Amino acid sequence: KEMKVKNIFILAAMSLTLASCSDLFEPAEENNRGLDEIYNEPTYAQGLLGYGYAMLPYNTKSVTDIATDDAVSNDLTNSFLKMATGSWTANSDPMSRWTNGRASIQYLNIFLQEVDKVNWAKDENARKMYCDSRKGEAYALRALNLYYLLMNHGGWTADGKLLGVPNLTEPETSTDDFNKPRNTFQECLDQIYSDLDEAAKLLPLDYNDLTNDNDVPAKYKEIGVKTAGDYNRVFGSIMRGRISGRIAEAIRSQVSLLAASPAFSEGTNVDYAKAADDAATV
């Protein structure tokens, strides 16, 4: 009888051990987050938008002198050293914006496709304002990333055509044709200007706090935003550092100056008069 009881305990212990090891036989799902998770998690959605900021070429190191005769790098694999010693090729281009620029535009296209579905706030009026604000930033960032792609990869062909880059306004999927031809430089300019126009409609000129409820923009009064405090929650000084309407106009000025320059002016409809007008707007 004592042996039977002992066997029962042994069997019970074994069953618990096997139950606790079920994960060994049934692997857990991969920890990959799906796109549908952005709808109820605004911070996740902002990660898509944030990529457009993070990949901008504003972190240039101070040691770029090694691309000239003024300094020398001891790192033989350094891209700037290769650039200075005659190895500047398509596979070794320290000034390239292709990978980061194209990736940024892909993320921004996904964001623009999904932004209206994101629950930015529990309050519906705040949700609509956040949607406008983030969408305006995305349009401006797409324009800015396309500008850097044009500046680095646009140019004249042997037969005298001024080409830009493939102009993408929809997210690419794994089944898409990636052999897209380059759009003309002017077509890329038109897309940039169009995106900046959209950004200007959605963003405030500057992120300043309103002090009077009567100053709430009419389009937001119409949807029920009644107080300056509600407006400031989305468009107030707390948002400084993000792209504003004025920054979008500054981007337009940069783009027009590039297009009107001697390098590109003969292939565009932009001249220095337009560049000056755009600069004056800022």
Language-model features: locations:
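Acidic, serine/threonine/proline-rich low-complexity intrinsically disordered regions
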Residues: 250, 259-277
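Surface-exposed intrinsically disordered loops and tails
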Residues: 182, 206-237
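Membrane-proximal, proline-rich intrinsically disordered regions
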Residues: 21-68, 125
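Bacterial Sec-dependent N-terminal signal peptides
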Residues: 1-31
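Conserved, well-structured interaction surfaces
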Residues: 41, 46-47, 79-156, 173-190, ...
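Surface-exposed extracellular loop regions of Gram-negative outer-membrane beta-barrel proteins
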Residues: 23-24, 249-257
